Amino acid sequence: RRAAVIILKEFNGLKTPRVQALSRLYSCYSLAMDDIRPPKLEVYRDETVARDYDQRWSGALGKKRDVRKARAILKAFGILKEHHGVSFQNALDIPCGTGRFSDLFDAQGCHTIGADLSVEMLQQARTKHPQQDFLCADMGRLPFEDNAIDVGVCIRMLHLVHSSELRISFLRELNRVCKFGAIIDYRHSHTVRILSRKLRYQLGAYKENPQLPSPRQIQLELQQA
């Protein structure tokens, strides 16, 4: 918990005026900093992992997945804009990682704030996008006032979180700070890919048992948030 505060002080993403206008400053420890934080998320605090992260998406398959995800995000942006009849002034990308989609969000005409708990990933993002704002933040307790953000975007995150309690705490924070809604990458267990992995795990051919929520559980978690 103490380390989380130190990290915030080391990474000066909160010092930009535009972010300060939206933020409230406090110790960022929360449920997300307890022992139930998934070990997979800690991997991204490794400097080597952060430096090499973008290579995962540099091949043909990675680029294809990026294009597919970008289309889904843009479609969701359009639905939210049409539903509320407004143009978004700002967006929160969390966890932003190395800023893979920062340019995509900025192209929507709104100021994008990238947030992540990994300082190492944020350093890569700032190098790639020096004109944009990035800050170190715990998704379980975001340093923003209520409704300070127009729209939030959370991709490649919740499928790594096996605790329903922790997922709900993240969703509640997004609901609190996002005025018009959030775009969530929420993956469920009833897919051919996941069912195949479960079978391979049972046969000893896959090292980890997939622990994704069912579609029904996802609905319940969204309702609780």
Give short role names for the model-derived ranges.
Residues 153:
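A conserved beta-strand element that flanks and buttresses the S-adenosyl-L-methionine
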Residues 187-208:
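Short, glycine-/aromatic-enriched active-site segment of Class I SAM-dependent methyltransferases
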Residues 168-180:
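A short glycine-rich, Lys/Arg-flanked "PGG" loop and its adjoining helix->strand segment in the class I
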Residues 156-160:
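Short catalytic micro-motifs in class I SAM-dependent methyltransferases
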Residues 32-85:
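Conserved class I S-adenosyl-L-methionine
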Residues 209-225:
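Short alpha-helix
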Residues 92, 98-141:
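Class I SAM-dependent methyltransferase SAM/SAH-binding core
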Residues 179-187:
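Conserved beta-strand signature within the Rossmann-like core of class I S-adenosyl-L-methionine
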